[in-house]
C-alpha cells in the first residue's frame, strides 16, 4: 500500500489523559493508538506500547524538567496530538507551564477505586488553567462484577465534576477496559472507538490562532526618520494589516490607540502579518518614547492592563535550579510576562505559612506596574534573572 500524504485538511486538536496514578492513563493512551492502528490504518496511526509511552523523554520548559509523552493519531475526521504525563508532578508542571495546552482531556478513573485525591486535583487544575471539556473514561470495568457499584462510581465522578463547575450531569462517561482493548478483545476495542467518536463530537474544534484577536508582545522599538515609530516582535495570535486600528497596552497607566501604516518582515512589505510571524509594525502618531518593550499591541478592547490576579504556580525544586529555601507571605520576586520583568508581591492562601521548592500553590499577586494579562497568560517567577517558578493566570482581580 502506498504511503498516505499527511493530510493538513483535517482539523488539529490537542488532548491528553488525566487522572490518579495507576488508574490507567498510559494504558489508555497505548490502547487508543493500537486500536486506531487496527481499525483505521494510516501512516499517522501507529501503535505505541505502554513501555514506549511510559519512557517519556525529559524536556525542559521554561527551566522546569518535565517528562511528557507526545503521541499522534487520527480519526476519520480529525488529527490529534495526545499528551500523557507519567508522574503526578509532571502532570502538574505541564498544566501550569502551559507546555501542554489541551483543548480537552480524557479523565481516567479506575472503576475499582472511584475518584481519588489526584482525580480531584487534576479536575481543579483543569478548571484553573482553562481546559473546558472533559470526557470520563471509567477504566477496569472488567474487574467489577457489581453493576450497582459501577453506577455509584459514575455518580461520584459526576458529583465531583459538578463541584468544580464542569457539567457533571451532562458530560459523557464511557465505561471500558484499556488493557482488554490493548489485548485485542473486540468488545472492548469497540468501546475505544466509541470513546474516540465521543472525543470527536464533544470536544469542539479549537479556534485557530489567526482567527483570534491580535496580540503582539513588543520586543524592540526604533524610529525611522520621516516615517514614524516601528515596534517589532512575534505575533502571538491574530493578524495585522495596514490601516488597522490597534491599542498599545500595559506598563503605562494610559492605553494608547494608533493606526498601522506598514507591516514588514525581513525588510519586505507585507499585506498582513499572521500569528507566528516576526514583524515590524509602523505606527502613525506614536512617539518613540510612547511605546516600550513589555507592552503589547492588540486589537482595541481585546485585552486590558491589570495589576492584581490569582495565579496557579509551580516553584522549582533545588535540583531544577530553583530556590534552596522556602518563601513566605509578601515575597517580592520579578514576574516575567512575555518580554519583560515586573516586580510584584505574593500573598499566600489562608492557612499556608510558606511555600517549599517543588510545591505547587495558588497565589494572589499584585504587580507594581499594570501588564496586559488575561486568564491563561503564562509567566515565570524570577530572582535576579534566574527562574525560580512558573505560573499561569487563573483569575483577574483588578
UniProtKB/Swiss-Prot annotation:
Recorded GO CC terms: cytosol
Location of this chain's protein in the cell: Cytoplasm
Region (G1): 19-26
Database matches in SUPFAM superfamilies: EF-Tu/eEF-1alpha/eIF2-gamma C-terminal domain, P-loop containing nucleoside triphosphate hydrolases, Translation proteins
Binding sites annotated in the UniProt record for GTP: 19-26, 84-88, 139-142
Domain tr-type G span(s) in chain numbering: 10-207
Enzyme class: hydrolase
Disulphide-bridged cysteine pairs: none
InterPro entries found in the cross-reference section: EF-Tu_GTP-bd, EF-Tu_GTPase, EFTu-like_2, EFTU_2, G_TR_CS, P-loop_NTPase, Small_GTP-bd, T_Tr_GTP-bd_dom
Catalytic activity, reaction form: GTP + H2O = GDP + phosphate + H(+)
Region span, G4: 139-142
Spans annotated as G3: 84-87
Residues the record lists as binding Mg(2+): 26
Subunit structure, as described in the record: Monomer.
Family: Belongs to the TRAFAC class translation factor GTPase superfamily. Classic translation factor GTPase family. EF-Tu/EF-1A subfamily.
Protein name as annotated: Elongation factor Tu
Gene it is expressed from: tuf
Amino acid at each position: 500500500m502506498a504511503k498516505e500524504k499527511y493530510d493538513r485538511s483535517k482539523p488539529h486538536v490537542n488532548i491528553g489523559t488525566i487522572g490518579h496514578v495507576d488508574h490507567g492513563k498510559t494504558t489508555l493512551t497505548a490502547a487508543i493508538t493500537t486500536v486506531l492502528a487496527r481499525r483505521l490504518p494510516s501512516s499517522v496511526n501507529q501503535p505505541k506500547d505502554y513501555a514506549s509511552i511510559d519512557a517519556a523523554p525529559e524536556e525542559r520548559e521554561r527551566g522546569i524538567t518535565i517528562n511528557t509523552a507526545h503521541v499522534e493519531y487520527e480519526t476519520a475526521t480529525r488529527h490529534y496530538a495526545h499528551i500523557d504525563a507519567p508522574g503526578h508532578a509532571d502532570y502538574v508542571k505541564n498544566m501550569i507551564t502551559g507546555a501542554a495546552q489541551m483543548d480537552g482531556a480524557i479523565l481516567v478513573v479506575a472503576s475499582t477505586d472511584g475518584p481519588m485525591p489526584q482525580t480531584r486535583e487534576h479536575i481543579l487544575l483543569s478548571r484553573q488553567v482553562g481546559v473546558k471539556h472533559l470526557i470520563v473514561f471509567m477504566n477496569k470495568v472488567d474487574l467489577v462484577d457489581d453493576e450497582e457499584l459501577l453506577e455509584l462510581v459514575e455518580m461520584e465522578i459526576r458529583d465531583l465534576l459538578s463541584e468544580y463547575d464542569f457539567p457533571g450531569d451532562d458530560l459523557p462517561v464511557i465505561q471500558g477496559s484499556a488493557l482488554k482493548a490493548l489485548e485485542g478483545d473486540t468488545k472492548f476495542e469497540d468501546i475505544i472507538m466509541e470513546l474516540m467518536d465521543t472525543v470527536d463530537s464533544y470536544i469542539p474544534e479549537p479556534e485557530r490562532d489567526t482567527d483570534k484577536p491580535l496580540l503582539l508582545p513588543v520586543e524592540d522599538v526604533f524610529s525611522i526618520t520621516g516615517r514614524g515609530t516601528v515596534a517589532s516582535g512575534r505575533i502571538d495570535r491574530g493578524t495585522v494589516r495596514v490601516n488597522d486600528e490597534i491599542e498599545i497596552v500595559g506598563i503605562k497607566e494610559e492605553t494608547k490607540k494608533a493606526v498601522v501604516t506598514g507591516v514588514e518582515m525581513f525588510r519586505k512589505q507585507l499585506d498582513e502579518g499572521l500569528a507566528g510571524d516576526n514583524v515590524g509594525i509602523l505606527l502613525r502618531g506614536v512617539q518613540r518614547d510612547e511605546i516600550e518593550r513589555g507592552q503589547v499591541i492588540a486589537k482595541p478592547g481585546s485585552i486590558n492592563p491589570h495589576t492584581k490576579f490569582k495565579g496557579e504556580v509551580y516553584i522549582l525544586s533545588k535540583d531544577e535550579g530553583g530556590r534552596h529555601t522556602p518563601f513566605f507571605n509578601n515575597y517580592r520576586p520579578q514576574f516575567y510576562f512575555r518580554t519583560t520583568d515586573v516586580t510584584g508581591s505574593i500573598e499566600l492562601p489562608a492557612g499556608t505559612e510558606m511555600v517549599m521548592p517543588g510545591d505547587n500553590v495558588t497565589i494572589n499577586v499584585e504587580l507594581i506596574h499594570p501588564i496586559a494579562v488575561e486568564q491563561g497568560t503564562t509567566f515565570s517567577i524570577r530572582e535576579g534573572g534566574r527562574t525560580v517558578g512558573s505560573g499561569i493566570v487563573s483569575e483577574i482581580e483588578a
